[in-house]
């Protein structure tokens, strides 16, 4: 698939093998995996980071295979998922950092263009999340709300 704001092709890479059953070498029960996810979420890790930690340190290839639930669903069940979705929060974090940079370097036109692209991605995601009911219908993106949300998170 192509990139959103470039005329280049997308990234290719290896794909995860399609598995329908839990590998026999995994020695964790679904309850243990769920408990690990909750512990890591309480430490402040995002769901993507939790997946990497479980894969690299605990040898758990896929949480959904073992528990039947995605990491984000486990976090939502225990009330640990953030109010604003993580992908939107990460984009807002990038926009806030770029705004700080542009305050010190106002003539950096390449970064100014990058900020425009990031904010257009944010607006796209906000539109999607409003239609899905994840965000309230009157929620609006402004640089100030983004700064407050990033500082809070």
UniProtKB/Swiss-Prot annotation:
Sorted keywords for this record are: Ribonucleoprotein, Ribosomal protein
GO process terms (BP): translation
Keyword match Chloroplast: no
Please give an example of a GO cellular component term from this record. cytosolic small ribosomal subunit
Task: Work out whether the entry's keyword set contains Ribosomal protein.
Answer: yes
Q: Which family does it belong to?
A: Belongs to the universal ribosomal protein uS15 family.
NCBIfam families listed in its UniProt record: PRK08561.1
* Subunit annotation: Part of the 30S ribosomal subunit.
Protein name as annotated: Small ribosomal subunit protein uS15
Which species expresses this protein natively? Methanocaldococcus jannaschii (strain ATCC 43067 / DSM 2661 / JAL-1 / JCM 10045 / NBRC 100440) (Methanococcus jannaschii)
């Amino acid at each position: 698939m192509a990139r959103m704001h470039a005329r280049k092709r997308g990234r290719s890479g290896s794909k995860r093998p399609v598995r329908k059953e839990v590998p026999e070498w995994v020695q964790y029960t679904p309850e243990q995996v769920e408990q690990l996810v909750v512990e890591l979420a309480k430490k402040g890790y995002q769901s993507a980071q939790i997946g990497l930690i479980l894969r690299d340190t605990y040898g758990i290839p896929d949480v959904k295979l073992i528990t039947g639930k995605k990491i984000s669903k486990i976090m939502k069940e225990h009330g640990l998922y953030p109010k604003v979705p993580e992908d939107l929060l990460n984009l807002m974090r990038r926009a806030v950092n770029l705004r700080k940079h542009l305050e010190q370097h106002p003539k950096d036109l390449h970064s100014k263009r990058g900020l425009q692209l990031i904010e257009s991605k944010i607006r796209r995601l906000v539109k999607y999340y409003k239609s899905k009911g994840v965000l309230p219908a009157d929620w609006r993106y402004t640089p100030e709300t983004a700064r407050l949300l990033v500082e809070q998170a």
